[in-house]
Amino acid sequence: MHIARSRGASTVMQAVLAFAFGMGWLGAGLAWLFISMHDYGGMPAPLAALALILFAAYLSVYPTLASAIAWRWCADRGPLRLALGLAGAWTLAELARGWVFTGFPWLALGYAQIDGPLTGLAPLAGVFALGGAAIGVASLCASALV
């Protein structure tokens, strides 16, 4: 996001990049669903692959919206505001992903931080806030490098 900001990308281009990120992240993380649907559920392989792609595309809407909201409201106000906006929008998007239409809270970013330096936040704020904090720290680090 910070690289796109430094190059003057539009909101639509930023959303496309965020959707591609979501498809890669969630598509790889949910690959086990193909095995469940195909090997154990008896679903034909092309249909199982299509179901996985469509499910990953649906779930990718959440990080896309978070990124687009942060981009639209915060990108022109400096890297600190962008980092805070992205952290807040990401946290709300992960909460929504875990709740809307009965939710699918798997692959929340906060779970990856269980043995990391942000672990102390987990009992205080929960896994979704931990993911938001990780996004905020990563965003600040990225802005320092760009």
Cite the ranges covered by each PLM segment.
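Membrane-embedded alpha-helical bundles of multi-pass enzymes
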Residues: 1-146
